[in-house]
């Protein structure tokens, strides 16, 4: 792993972008539940022709089609995927994370905020006509949940 980290740190930002585009295309743009906009990334890979050539000459990547490339080392691909997981995972500090886990009624504060954000998005999309419907639905769910727990 130290070898991969040293190699990664030696690359320029442009080379890291190329490696990321190649690696993501190799795993269909998904790492666990994270999904990336592959169409845009693959379209932009030709902007990095010098880096593609350099990485190909170094034996790091291999051309497998017109705009298709792959990493030559499978172990590096999985090291890279672990790095991306760490980078893209929630970056809240410990205190923020812990507070978000606190139960506030039936839900954690984080879940309550997510539901509130979702409701606001739905309301904005559907307009005022649907607000009454959504509020009635939400009140019905809340009443049913309270009844189910004996309140």
Positions of PLM-derived features:
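Short, amphipathic alpha-helical interaction segments positioned at domain boundaries
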Residues: 75-106
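Residue-level detection of the helix-turn-helix DNA-binding "recognition helix"
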Residues: 53, 57, 81
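Intrinsic, short, N-terminal disordered tails of RNA polymerase sigma-factor systems
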Residues: 101-102, 106-117
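A short, conserved structural fragment
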Residues: 56-66
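Minor-groove-contacting beta-hairpin "wing" of winged helix-turn-helix DNA-binding domains
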Residues: 67-73
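Membrane-inserting effector segments that mediate pore formation, membrane fusion
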Residues: 112-151
């Amino acid at each position: 792993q130290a070898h991969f980290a040293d190699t990664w740190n030696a690359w320029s930002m442009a080379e890291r972008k190329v490696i990321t585009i190649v690696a993501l295309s190799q795993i269909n743009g998904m790492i666990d539940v994270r999904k990336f906009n592959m169409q845009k990334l693959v379209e932009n890979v030709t902007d990095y022709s010098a880096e593609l050539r350099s990485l190909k000459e170094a034996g790091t990547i291999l051309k497998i089609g017109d705009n298709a490339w792959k990493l030559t080392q499978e172990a590096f691909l999985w090291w890279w995927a672990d790095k991306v997981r760490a980078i893209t995972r929630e970056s809240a500090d410990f205190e923020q994370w812990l507070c978000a886990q606190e139960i506030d009624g039936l839900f954690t504060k984080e879940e309550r905020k997510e539901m509130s954000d979702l409701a606001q998005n739905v309301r904005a999309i559907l307009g005022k006509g649907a607000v009454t419907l959504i509020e009635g639905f939400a009140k019905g769910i809340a009443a049913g949940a309270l009844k189910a727990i004996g309140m």
